[in-house]
């Protein structure tokens, strides 16, 4: 709870253009007022609870995201921000479908269930599923160098682990996520029937982390899945001794596009209204969670910053605008 308050305070203070070494009494009093209001009167957790518990997951193109859109707009209107509006755009519609199935199939080893989630934007297998021998790669470059004949009709497993030694998790994520975003398309190009990707996470449990993958328009598409950490370890260990076969089944599919809206609210600048400071978050989330951390928190923080400044009597010279973006995830 303290972390959310500190983030709100930091965002609020950063919008007040003062130098601490030459701070006037008025500046100090304003910061003290913001601190007290953020700690004592914060509404952010109340809004976040409604967003996550009452509305829930908010994937683009779903009724839940539309509900979150109108809830956020109504909230900013009730707070009497100077301007509140919706910015229309087109968003993709992707359906996960039935619960995914994935298991190792071996006459010698038996059958082992693997924990998977279909990647966002991916196609399904249909009701019969697909089965193939697994080949393991640790980079897109390694797969690129393989002869297509070695990949054809195989299931490619991208097994490069999360870089746990990295000081910043964002850097570790960035150094690993390429195999999820671009790996399946490359595997499809080389003739694979499906792709598995080690979840992009430092967690050592077996909960797969979904995320988006991208296929170019008109490109051949294959089913692709995020694989839980423990399932990834198991598959890698078994496949190290001799190639194993895996069966996958999913019914996910793309359903075109539909209308979506960015939600925008602002405090209009008194002196330079056309110079705009933007803060924001993305309102959408994946379909298998509540989207609290990613990124409901960023949305309610942005609204709360404007509320704090307004309720404290702060009159910005430049426009301060909060934008809740509608489609970051896929």
Please place each PLM-identified region on the residue numbering:
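Bacterial Sec-dependent N-terminal signal peptides
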Residues: 1-26
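Stable alpha-helical elements in mature extracytoplasmic
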Residues: 26-30, 43-47, 55, 64-72, ...
């Amino acid at each position: 709870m303290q972390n959310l308050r500190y983030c709100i305070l930091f965002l609020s203070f950063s919008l007040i253009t003062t130098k601490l070494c030459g701070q006037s009494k008025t500046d100090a009093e304003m910061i003290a007022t913001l601190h007290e209001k953020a700690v004592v009167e914060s509404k952010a957790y109340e809004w976040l609870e409604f967003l996550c518990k009452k509305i829930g997951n908010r994937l683009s193109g779903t009724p839940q995201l539309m509900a979150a859109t109108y809830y956020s707009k109504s909230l900013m209107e009730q707070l009497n921000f100077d301007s509140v509006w919706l910015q229309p755009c087109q968003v993709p519609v992707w359906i996960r479908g039935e619960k995914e199935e994935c298991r190792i199939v071996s006459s010698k080893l038996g059958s082992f269930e693997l924990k998977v989630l279909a990647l966002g934007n991916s196609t399904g297998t249909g009701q019969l599923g697909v089965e193939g021998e697994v080949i393991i790669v640790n980079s897109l470059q390694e797969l690129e160098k393989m002869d297509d004949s070695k990949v054809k009709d195989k299931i490619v497993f991208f097994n490069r682990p999360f870089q746990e030694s990295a000081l910043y998790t964002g850097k570790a994520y960035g150094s690993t996520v390429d195999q999820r975003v671009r790996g399946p398309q490359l595997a499809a190009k080389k003739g694979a029937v499906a792709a598995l990707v080690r979840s992009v996470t430092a967690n050592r449990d077996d909960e797969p982390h979904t995320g988006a993958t991208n296929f170019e328009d008109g490109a051949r598409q294959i089913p692709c899945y995020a694989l839980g950490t423990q399932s990834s370890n198991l598959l890698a260990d078994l496949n190290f001794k001799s190639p194993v076969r895996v069966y996958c089944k999913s019914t996910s599919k793309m359903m075109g596009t539909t209308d979506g809206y960015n939600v925008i609210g602002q405090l209009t600048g008194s002196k330079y209204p056309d110079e705009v400071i933007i803060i924001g978050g993305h309102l959408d989330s994946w379909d298998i969670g509540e989207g609290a951390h990613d990124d409901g928190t960023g949305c309610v923080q942005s609204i709360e910053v404007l509320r704090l400044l307004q309720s404290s009597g702060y009159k910005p010279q430049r426009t301060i605008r909060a934008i809740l973006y509608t489609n970051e995830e896929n």
